[in-house]
Amino acid sequence: MKIEKVQIKNFKSLRDIEIVLRGFTLITGVNSSGKSTFIQSLLLLKENRELINQIATNSMMMSSLGEHPEPLKTHIFKLVEDTKKQPISLEGEYIHLGDKKDIFNQEVYEEDISILINTLPLKEINFTINYNNLSLSSTTQIPLSNVINLFSDDFQYLNTDRIQPDRTYELSEKHIRKNLIGTKGEYTAHYLYENRDRPLNIKALKHENTKTDRLLDNVSFWLSEISNGVKVLPKKHLDTHQASLSYQYTYGENTTNEYSPLNVGFGITYVLPIIVSILKSKPDDLLIIENPESHLHPVGQSKIAKLCAIAVANGVQIIVESHSDHFLNAIRVATKEDILKPEDSAIYYFSKIADSMETKVEQLLIDANGKINQNWPKGFFDEYDNQLDKLISW
């Protein structure tokens, strides 16, 4: 199920905020205002999903204690108590949060962290992190892997530090089996090789210029929207247990030799995991992307936003952190062109409360004409106008 709302208390700079998520949710704002902290709150739960599921399993066992013999009851009691004492993990595949002092709000330091998630259809689950021992408690009584898309094996997070052009890349059978490409997209080459003939789950994501719904064909055609005529070629090298990428360009009737990622534009490889993540998605999946605009020309930024819009219109839930006005405007255009409905998207502007380290969050909505009718907060994509005013005044 999709996440409908998240309420967070006492996590880093997030003293008490509420975010209503839509199909597409854009997180933006000034630097160091709490945007990544919001994403980290979700990743913290994802990182500790096994502990959360154990808590749920314990709850189910406790509810049926009367049916078991005494020795088994004693064992269950011990298991439950041991789980209660187990601290959450602050380091792992999804998060690198440091230690206890780094995650609690400094202005109310001795209060527990609370993260409340509402799902669709409406179901409320509260997670509490104890200030004293970092133990986790939860109101869920069932394992969440099949209940909330955040805990699904198909959840994909791409942080801003993605793979760069290189001669070879890692293999990971574990990630490929789980339909994942890594938080940096580091297994993208391996994934593309193994799944090159796999049909798209969402037919609407098929590029208009390709005749097939093969993943690799569509990745190349969407990539060519960013660099005209490019084709990506993944390879797997069993002798070195590595994967590689190369690129070819087609112009007219001609095709170039294969080029290493080191010999084409940096942004081509940097955006590749984003395109793959969107094209491999299916309805109800959750995808979180940080700074998709990095190293892309404005046209490329707009194309990625349009691809996101098509995925959202077909049931994927996407959270994007971005500073790009081109990305925002492309989502507005997608709404005006009826790819997205107004209720499909929400924008949140993060800033800091004056004379405080506390995050302030303001919601903005896009109407059917692509307009943002609320007053734009100071700092919300207004720098173009600020600089233009200075030019005009000369």
Where do the protein language model's features map onto the residues?
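C-terminal lobe/lid and adjacent interdomain/linker elements of RecA-like ASCE P-loop ATPase modules
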Residues: 1, 303-394
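Pre-Walker A-like glycine/lysine-rich segment at the N-terminus of P-loop NTPase domains
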Residues: 1-50, 54-65, 297
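Phosphate-coordinating catalytic segments in nucleotide- and nucleic-acid-processing enzymes
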Residues: 4, 48-273, 277, 282, ...
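Short, solvent-exposed loop/turn segments at secondary-structure junctions
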Residues: 11-13, 26, 32-33, 162-165, ...
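Phosphate-binding P-loop
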Residues: 16-22, 253, 278-283, 310-312
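Walker A/P-loop NTP-binding motif
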Residues: 42-49, 278-280, 306-310
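Walker B catalytic motif
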Residues: 289-292
